[in-house]
Amino acid sequence: PEHKVRFSFDWNKPEAHYCSQCKHYWTGNKRYDWAWVNVAHTHNYTYLRNCMYLYLATGNKVYAEYIRNMLLDYASKYITYLDHDTARKVGPWGGKMFGQSLDESAWASDVCRAYMVAKSIMTTNEIREIEKGYLIPCSKLLLRRRGTANWQVWHNSGLIALGVALENDSIINVAINDPECGYHAQMERYVMDDGWWGEGSPTYHYYPLRAMLLSADAVRCRNINLYDRKLYKMLAAPASGVYADLYFPAHNDGWYGESFIAQVSLYEIAYQRYNKDPFFLSVLQQCYRYTDRNFGEALQNNIEIPQVTAMAAWPSVHFKETGYAVLRSGTK
């Protein structure tokens, strides 16, 4: 707090938080202790996601067992967690693991994918325990959280993931088709015709876009196709409006320094789902001039991306609804 650096996380010290600058453990502050819980759940999320990709890549059953064991542990505890918001009170936007239903939804969106990947090695009783202890209680919580904009987009993503995991089409239907809060309602209300999210900033555009991609991918197994023209435009618009160095301008309430390269994993999915779209191929090639292709989403793609060394000569573009324009000359 004095040196403006993040505390070093220690699994064994939930109530003592080490500052690398002053070499001191900070104790006696409940807000720091609550933050430790937040970080612990986030580390577990990363662990489950990594195990999912490792199991898919290697077929080694041990990674599926890691997923099963952690989810069984969560299932034994989740219902004991109190509903709370960021002030540790019961509120309309609180969660159980996190102080925001937004974070609860994001966690569920990916963790349910890990569950589905590992489900085949689980017994009937283990599946029932995870459903009763985590999947069903979390879905009930999120069904009570009716918001707008990026919050609701993530609520829907979490609900879709939970609905698919539970094979419950009624949950999926609410998340997609609810006239006020569903996926289609949010897409209609907040995505402009030129593809930009209503806030008009890459910083805020990609946050709901990832939830929408997760939603679209999740329901493919239920024979629902959300990969329509509007989602395509949501992916293409910011990519079309990037600087030659693959950084975004600082428009609306965003800020300069936002890198397009940080979003390349989303275009691995887009390239595959939109039938090897040539623009998305060019996007991937340009990004991989600057970074390694080591994203988990590349495993889902399983397609060779030819390397290029030259900068792309993308055309000038005018986003009529948003009011942005990019003038280009060759690669500049």
Residue ranges: model-predicted function:
Residues 43, 100-103, 151, 179, ...:
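Secondary-structure capping and boundary motifs in well-ordered enzyme cores
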Residues 57-58, 118-129, 166-170, 218-227:
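Inter-helical turn/loop segments and adjacent helix faces that build the functional surface
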Residues 160, 166, 204-332:
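Carbohydrate-active enzyme catalytic cores, enriched for enzymes
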Residues 144, 148, 171-175, 185-197:
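A mid-sequence, solvent-exposed acidic-amphipathic segment
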Residues 1-147, 153-160, 176, 180, ...:
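Extracellular glycan-targeting catalytic surfaces
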Residues 78-82, 187, 191, 242, ...:
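Short amphipathic alpha-helical interaction/hinge segments
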Residues 190-201, 219-224:
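Acidic, serine/threonine- and proline-rich low-complexity regulatory regions
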Residues 158-186:
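Alpha-helical cores of eukaryotic small-GTPase signaling modules
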